[in-house]
């Protein structure tokens, strides 16, 4: 038997807790609580079913001129969207903690009439804002490109002809065609005729609704059967989509976590730098009797250089590069900060249909036959004979059967009569004659218990068939019975076919990988409890499932209690998923998990998912999601399946690692600079070593050298977004105390080595101490003042770049992971520029500080001074790296600031206990024994029979999945 499976769109079979009636747009459900969408639904339906005078009469089409006038009046048929003006983005780049500090420095420099220095600072400020603006605009353009590529179209009658146009330019009064397979482009009234409309994306109900002139198909729904002409009544913000978008604004979005982290880092570094610089300022005035002007200039320059001016630019660039990388994995990021949040996700709430499953119904090779000679192939042929096999399928069930059967074999029979599906009889029937033998017979297919009532040997096979139906129902399997008459006209049960929407081939492995990466997966579905249990079994998820009636009942989804996590968190964590839930339950589940301390991602596709998507830390609109879901989501998938989400997590963790290494480096560089000049100002002063230059009583660098360090470092750091990283195996969580400790260790070694070199240089510069200095021991001439300044500039510059390579590998040695070529080349170029500048600096007095190139000199030893500085820096770089690794080992050993225990986010998941019993929920503690299986089957028998009765009427059943058993079982084999 071939292992081939036959596919069918599973959306037509998806089950939800309740269904529409043909006459109601939004039926009342006694257990359903008012959701954040209910207000929009009720208002829209009151308007749609109100007096006829409220609606436009049936349209006969518009002209282009009329449509243009109406477009000016009503606006474009698009969801309302808030867009920040480009100029405002640029202005925001000129304000904030970092820009504000730089503005203060610029004002002070100009006030002191230091025009060149002020101009340099001003240029840095403008460059900072421009690059930040460019990266933000570029990221926004990527999102806009996605929206443009997904723009829906509409078939409209304009200028006396039918044409395809952008649905965004539809206006009230347009005549549109609503046909099977097309989306409803706006809120429309039906001129005449009847269509079946799928409103699952709007209401969460999967059963199609039959609509006529008294109904109004809504924008965002889909026509599944029929074709009519309709009149556009409402567009844009006046549609149900527009109402939903307005309601979503009530769910406030948290400020991106990365911005909170950056602000904390900025304020911490600014506070430290400001405090130390103020101490230097006061000390210089009191100790060296420096003028207010000179002391203030020194303090301001050190402050500006020490604070991370380009912090937001580098982070924005890194996130933008990450968004481009994600787009290659079929993931579009609508909010850059979502990448950082995604790296910390440790709880994923996933839809079932289409995400965990293929969303394609498949005939399985598990077939139960009741007569010798029958098998899956012959049963499928009989099922196809009970349909018009050479005509387009009449419904989803026929599509599946005809796609699986051998239609060439069916052509050996002539269909004399065909009775289509009748809701009363729950089956189809046909009379046929075999062209080869002339035998005449009847066939039928339908709900198993209906067919069972027809067969002549019902008493003989009744228990067997009921056991089969019950066992399949208990596993969430859908089934279809086929029967045939013999020469005496008696009905014989030919077989029972099984079909399901199976998991995607990679879903089970993807869930396993997710758990290995520290992410727990919860399935959230509106489907039947049995389906959810079977799906969890197939995917190795916890079979304990909560249904809607076991969840806490919340009256107002906009006013959730703050103790949900405390009361219900452990209960929700102890199950594998949730079944038969409504949109407001999804919202509540996400909020409970967030209160429990988890970073939660949520997948969804419909308008009803939008509030939960917005509430989640990371909302993910899956492939084929509605515009409303995309608008509420942080990420949009352009490829189906859960594996895409896992790829998003890994890429996001890579981005997080880049940001972590950058922040560690940036904090280290700031502490190194400010602490070096602070300590040098107090203890290692040229005045103490015999300096008589009034402008060289304490050690400092000219502003030009400071700015050169800043520009070269920031320019190189722009490439960190392209650096090689290895994603963490655990969810990433910002632990700023650990980051500051790691950065402080790097800074302490770099600062200590700089202070030591300054001490060596001052002794080599001093006439009093030269004889005992290292310069004298190495055979070097006494160090001039200008070369001392330039030497320290080169040392600080080299140490900064080497610290970058140490910070990027965390607790490993710097050679653990090679840098990317672009980062390496950027660092080499910057180091080369710094070395060349220090070597051949023209002897001058910028800011009255004497400077001189290190390579200028009479002897070869003097000309090789830059090389000696390089050797010194490299030796201390190795020391720095060893100290870093040892420090990380000690930090991990003592779990400093929870660097180990808090790595995965919210701690271990508690196993189920009796204390978790809420609303009667009890877990599946072990598989049922055979002695209890029959009782379980009988408990679901009546429910499964009732569901199977409606199999053909609504092309739906609450029994959906089956285990992939590729066998067929005959009665004799049993």
Curated annotation (Swiss-Prot):
It is a multi-pass membrane protein. GO terms for cellular component: membrane. Residues 113-117, 287-294, 652-661, 713-737, 841-868 are extracellular. The active site is at 351 (4-aspartylphosphate intermediate). The chain crosses the membrane at residues 93-112, 118-137, 265-286, 295-321, 631-651, 662-684, 698-712, 738-761, 813-840, 869-887. Residues 1-23, 950-959 have a biased composition (Basic and acidic residues). It holds the Pfam family Hydrolase. GO terms for molecular function: ATP binding; ATP hydrolysis activity; metal ion binding; P-type proton-exporting transporter activity. Disulfide bonds: none annotated. InterPro entries: ATPase_P-typ_cation-transptr_N, ATPase_P-typ_cyto_dom_N, ATPase_P-typ_P_site, ATPase_P-typ_TM_dom_sf, ATPase_P-typ_transduc_dom_A_sf, HAD-like_sf, HAD_sf, P-type_ATPase_IIIA. GO terms for biological process: proton export across plasma membrane. This is Probable proton ATPase 1A.
């Amino acid at each position: 038997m071939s292992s081939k499976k036959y596919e069918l769109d599973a959306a037509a079979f998806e089950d939800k807790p309740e269904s529409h009636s043909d006459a109601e747009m939004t039926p009342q459900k006694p257990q359903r609580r008012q959701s954040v969408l209910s207000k929009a639904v009720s208002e829209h339906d009151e308007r749609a079913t109100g007096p006829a005078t409220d609606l436009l009469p049936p349209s006969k089409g518009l002209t282009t001129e009329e449509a243009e006038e109406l477009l000016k009046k009503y606006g474009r048929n698009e969801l309302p969207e808030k867009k920040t003006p480009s100029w405002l983005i640029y202005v925001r780049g000129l304000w904030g903690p970092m820009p504000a500090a730089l503005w203060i420095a610029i004002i002070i420099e100009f006030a002191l009439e230091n025009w060149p220095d002020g101009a340099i600072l001003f240029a840095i400020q403008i460059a900072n804002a421009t690059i930040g603006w460019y990266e933000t605009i570029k990221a926004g353009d990527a999102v806009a490109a996605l929206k443009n590529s997904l723009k829906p179209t509409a078939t409209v009658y304009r200028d006396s002809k039918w044409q395809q146009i952008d649905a965004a330019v539809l206006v009230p009064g347009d005549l549109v065609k609503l046909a099977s397979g097309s989306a409803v482009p706006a809120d429309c009234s039906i001129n005449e005729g009847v269509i079946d409309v799928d409103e699952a994306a709007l209401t969460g109900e999967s059963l199609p609704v039959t609509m006529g002139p008294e109904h109004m198909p809504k924008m965002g729904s889909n026509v599944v059967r029929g074709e009519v002409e309709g009149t556009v009544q409402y567009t844009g913000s006046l549609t149900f989509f527009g109402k939903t978008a307005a309601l979503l604004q009530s769910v406030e979005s948290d400020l991106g976590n990365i911005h909170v982290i950056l602000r904390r880092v900025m304020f911490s570094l600014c506070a430290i730098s400001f405090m130390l610089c103020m101490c230097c300022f006061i000390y210089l005035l009191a100790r060296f009797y420096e003028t207010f002007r000179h002391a203030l200039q020194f303090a301001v320059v050190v402050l500006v250089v020490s604070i991370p001016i380009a912090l937001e630019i580098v982070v924005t660039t890194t996130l933008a590069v990450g968004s481009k990388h994600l787009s290659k994995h079929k993931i579009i990021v609508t909010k850059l900060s979502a990448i950082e949040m995604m790296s910390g996700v440790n709880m994923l709430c996933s839809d079932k249909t289409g995400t965990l499953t293929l969303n394609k119904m498949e005939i399985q090779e598990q077939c139960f036959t009741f007569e010798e000679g029958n098998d899956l192939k012959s049963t499928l042929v009989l099922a196809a004979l009970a349909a018009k096999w050479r005509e387009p399928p009449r419904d989803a069930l026929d599509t599946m059967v005809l796609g699986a059967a051998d239609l060439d074999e069916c052509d050996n029979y002539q269909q004399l009569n065909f009775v289509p599906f009748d809701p009363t009889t729950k089956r189809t029937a046909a009379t046929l004659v075999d062209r080869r033998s002339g035998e005449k017979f009847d066939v039928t297919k339908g709900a198993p218990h209906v067919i069972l009532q027809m067969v002549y040997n019902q008493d003989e096979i009744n228990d067997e068939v009921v056991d089969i139906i019950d066992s399949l129902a208990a596993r969430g399997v859908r089934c279809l019975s086929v029967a045939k008459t013999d020469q005496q006209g008696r009905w014989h049960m030919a077989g029972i076919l099984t079909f399901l929407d199976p998991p995607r081939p990679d879903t089970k492995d993807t869930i396993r990988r997710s758990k290995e990466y520290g992410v727990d997966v919860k399935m959230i579905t509106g489907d039947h409890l049995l389906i959810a249990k079977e799906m969890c079994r197939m995917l190795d998820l916890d079979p304990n499932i909560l249904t809607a009636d076991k969840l806490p009942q919340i009256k107002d989804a906009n006013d959730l209690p703050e103790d949900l996590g405390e009361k219900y968190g452990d209960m929700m964590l102890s199950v594998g998923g949730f079944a038969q839930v409504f949109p407001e339950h999804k919202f509540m589940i996400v909020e409970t998990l967030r209160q429990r301390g988890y970073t939660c991602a949520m997948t969804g596709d419909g308008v009803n998912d939008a509030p939960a998507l917005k509430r989640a830390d990371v909302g993910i609109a899956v492939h084929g999601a509605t515009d409303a879901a995309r608008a509420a989501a942080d990420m949009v998938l352009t490829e189906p399946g859960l594996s895409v989400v896992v790829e998003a997590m890994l890429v996001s963790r890579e981005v997080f690692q880049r940001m972590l290494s950058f922040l560690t480096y940036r904090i280290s560089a700031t502490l190194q600079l400010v602490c070096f000049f602070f300590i040098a100002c107090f203890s290692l002063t040229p005045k103490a070593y015999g300096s008589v230059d009034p402008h060289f009583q304490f050690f400092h660098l000219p502003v030009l050298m400071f700015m050169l360090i800043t520009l070269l470092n920031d320019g190189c750091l722009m490439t960190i977004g392209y650096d090689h990283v290895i994603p963490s195996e655990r969810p990433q969580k910002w632990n700023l105390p650990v980051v500051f400790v790691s950065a402080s260790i790097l800074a302490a070694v770099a600062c200590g080595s700089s202070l030591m070199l300054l001490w060596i240089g001052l002794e080599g510069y001093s006439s009093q101490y030269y004889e005992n200095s290292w310069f004298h021991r190495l055979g070097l001439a006494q160090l001039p003042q200008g070369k001392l300044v330039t030497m320290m500039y080169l040392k600080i510059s080299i140490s900064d770049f080497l610290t970058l390579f140490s910070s990027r590998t965390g607790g490993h040695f710097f050679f653990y992971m090679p840098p990317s070529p672009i980062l390496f080349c950027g660092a080499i170029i910057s180091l080369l520029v710094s070395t060349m500048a220090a070597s051949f600096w023209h002897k001058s007095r910028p800011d009255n500080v004497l400077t001189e190139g290190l390579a200028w000199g009479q002897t070869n030893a003097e000309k090789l001074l830059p090389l000696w500085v390089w050797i010194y820096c490299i030796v201390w770089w190795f020391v720095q790296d060893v100290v870093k690794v040892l420090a990380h080992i000690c930090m991990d050993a003592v779990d400093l600031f929870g660097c180990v225990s808090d790595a995965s986010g919210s701690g271990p998941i508690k196993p189920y206990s009796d204390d978790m019993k809420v609303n009667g929920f009890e877990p599946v503690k072990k598989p049922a024994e055979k002695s209890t299986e029959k009782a379980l089957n009988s408990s679901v028998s009546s429910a499964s029979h009732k569901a199977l009765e409606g199999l053909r009427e609504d092309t739906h059943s609450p029994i959906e999945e089956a285990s992939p058993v590729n066998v067929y079982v005959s009665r004799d084999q049993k």
